Amino acid sequence: MELNPFLPLLTPSSEGTPFEFECELETIYWLNLHLRIPTRILIRYAEFSALSFAELFDKSVRLPWNQYICKDTVLNIRTTCRKSKLYHSDAVTQRIHEAIQSNLGCKLQLASSDDQSQLSKQQLIIVRLFHDHLTISIDSSGNPLYMRGYKQTSAKAPLRENLAAAIITASGWQPQYPLFDPFCGS
């Protein structure tokens, strides 16, 4: 299995994500480069309770955003709110955006929700607010990992690369045996 070296670090997650673990930044680089199955790798950046917009802003503005966000970055903030006093996801997104700008001391463009054209130039920030508990995650992968690689020409594939890799891994296939690909890799 591709995560065997990391099994001692992995713990089940209650948020529906398959794995959660702690590691160094260098390990995240390695994971993004070598893993075939994940779509993206998120860095759990902050967790705190937020019962009001003022509290949300105050706690968000104190985070060291300069560790992951440059001053010319276009932000793509995706927010979901469930069973919380702060239920308006656009207002939560606005407060997080304002907090980041205030912290960095500059204006940052906020990508519109329908602007998917320049994903590689955007920094994805995922904000989840559930039962008044806020979690901020920063995408470390850029484009989805199934889009990586140099492909001059390609056809529309019946499966994404990471889903195909997951199926092959789950099948128990070993590299020393031939693999028959009925789709011929599209």
What is each residue range found by the language model?
Residues 1-123:
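Non-catalytic nucleic-acid substrate-recognition regions in nucleic-acid-modifying enzymes
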Residues 85-87, 151-158, 169-170:
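Flexible, glycine/proline-enriched loop segments at strand-loop-helix junctions
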Residues 124, 133-135, 178-179:
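Beta-sheet entry/capping signal
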Residues 134-159:
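Class I SAM-dependent transferase core
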Residues 159-186:
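Conserved S-adenosyl-L-methionine
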